[in-house]
Each structure stands twice: as C-alpha cells, then as structure tokens.
Amino acid sequence: MQTILGAGGAIGTELLKELMRRQQPVRLVSRNPKEVQGVTETVAADISNLPQTIAAVAGSTVVYLLAGLKYDTKIWHELWPRIMSNAIEACKRANAKLVFFDNVYMYGKVVAPMTEETPFNPCSKKGEIRAQIATSLINEFKSGKLCAMIARSADFYVPDPRTSVANVLVFDKFAKKQKASWLINDAVPHSYTYTPDAAKSLALLADSESAWNQTWHVPTAPNPPTGKEFIRMAAKEFGVEPKYRVLSRPLIKVAGLFDTDIRESYEMLYQSDSAYVFHSSKFTKAFGQESTSYADGVRCTALAYQARLRAGAAISG
C-alpha cells in the first residue's frame, strides 16, 4: 500500500494519477478526502495528531508526505515540526518508507545554481522552519533509524488552476484575457518545476532501492527563462498580447496591509530579485528521466486551462 499524506494538493493530485497508472494500491489521507474512482482507500485524518497519523499510515509500505499548510509562519512554526515528527513515528511503527516532498526555502539566497549539495542557510522564518524539519528527517535516515528520502522541487506550475505563483500571476490572468503580473524582476532567470514531472519522479524514486536515504532534486528543465520570456511563452499559447506589470517591493508591502497571504509572502521576495536556478542533473544522470521543456509545459498548461473554460469551469484569481 502506498499512502499519500496531504492528498488534495497539486502534487498529490498528479502523484495519484501516476501511481494509478502503475497499478499501485493507493490510500489517500487528508482532513476531508474525496472518493476517487480506482483508489483503494480514502482516510480522513489530521496528521498533526499522532494517533490519527499512526492509524492512517498502518499497513503502508511507502508514505509520501505532501502536506500543504496555510501560508502562515505562525501555523508553520506550530504544526510543521509536529507533522514531521508524527510522520516519522508512524512510518517507524508501520515499517514503512517515507518520501518527503520539499521546497528550497532552507537554502536561502544563493548565487550559484541550487543542487542537492547546497548548504542550508535560510534567510526567512519559513526557511528556518523548513531547514529544521528537513534536518530532523536527514538525521533519522543518516542514523539508520528510518528508510526515507527528500525529493525537492523548485517553484512549480500546474496544468490546472492552483495556487502556485506562476498560475495565479500568469496563467489565471491570460485565461481571462487580463494583464499578467511578475514579482520584482522580470529580467532574471527563474526555474519552475512542472508538476507532472515531479509526480512521475516521486513514484520512480520510491520504486528504486538505490534512491533511498538521500536528497534528490526532482526533474526541472534546464536553462530557465526570465520572467519576460516565460510570460511571452504563456501569452503565445493563450493567443493574447504579452501584457504584464512588474510588482515592486513597495507595492507588495502596501498590498500586504490588506491581504494576509501577500503579507506572508513578503519575506520570500528575495527569490524573485535575482537569478533563481535549480539543477536536477543528479536525478537525470541516475534515472534518465528528462524534464518537460518550458515550451511544452507552458503549452500543456494553457491547453488544460482552455479545456476547463470550454467545459464551463471557473478560473480563480
């Protein structure tokens, strides 16, 4: 049994598709799980609660920790260490392997491309929390107490409307024939991971004995575009003019006075003011899975949006 903790997010949705394609028995765990045709089990559980987490993981061989919390430092500080501790303890009791899907906040602001060897040097409160929980898991598998791995992603974009920055600022807007936005600096390259690539790599990593007890960067296209180039690609696929505005720090700070999510994102703007380059060559060399090019990923994302519009589905934003 392969169990997804936090099954309702963008990565969980894509991972479910991949595991079902591989004909794996799957258990979906979330606070309010929805029945999905072909899924073996759905379990309602609060993974910040240890007994509920233990019960949700029981009988699993592989557990994917994909939880997404409200974008709030106070909530992260309170819940993330507890969730990681619960997942570790539950996997130990079930003799299950743990895959943690992580981001790059713990690296802080880096000049060189990010790799698995980039040291943790967080420059944000959220980054400090991510460094703490990643370190706790690394200590577990390095000491031989748990079979686990970390699969790390850059910022990502999603083939259907979700809350990733690229989707909210670019795809959602162009789908509604509106002007797009970009954060801080549109002239520097910014890596994005395409979520179907991430999901495929998670399933592949979990199925490979040689992948365990280490950190992997999931496949992400090389030679990332600048903000301006990314917007032009998206506009072309939506058949609109590449009109956009660059959101400055002062503007974002003022907007944060009226919007909690914007206020919480302010400390992460360092990721947008200079080059943000994410390398995944370790994965490619080990497994040969190539990442989807930006041109193809943007095209598929636009096509998914257009299909939703034809079906009468609403676009957020």
Language model segments and positions:
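N-terminal Rossmann NAD(P)H-binding glycine-rich loop of SDR-like oxidoreductase domains
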Residues: Q2-R22
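Glycine-rich "substrate-gating" loop/helix at the edge of Rossmann-like oxidoreductase active sites
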Residues: A154-S164, I184-P196, T220-P222
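A conserved pocket-lining segment of Rossmann-fold NAD(P)-dependent short-chain dehydrogenase/reductase
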Residues: D172-T193, S210-W212
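Mid/C-terminal beta-alpha module of Rossmann-like enzyme folds, strongest
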Residues: Q2, S201-S265, T292, D296-G317
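NAD(P)H-binding glycine-rich loop region in Rossmannoid oxidoreductase-like domains
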Residues: K34-A94
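Conserved C-terminal active-site "lid" loop/helix of NAD(P)H-dependent oxidoreductases
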Residues: A255-E290
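Conserved Rossmann-fold NAD(P)-dependent oxidoreductase catalytic core, especially the SDR/UDP-sugar
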Residues: R27, S85-R130, M149
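Conserved beta-loop-beta element that borders a ligand/cofactor-binding pocket
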Residues: N103, T135-D160
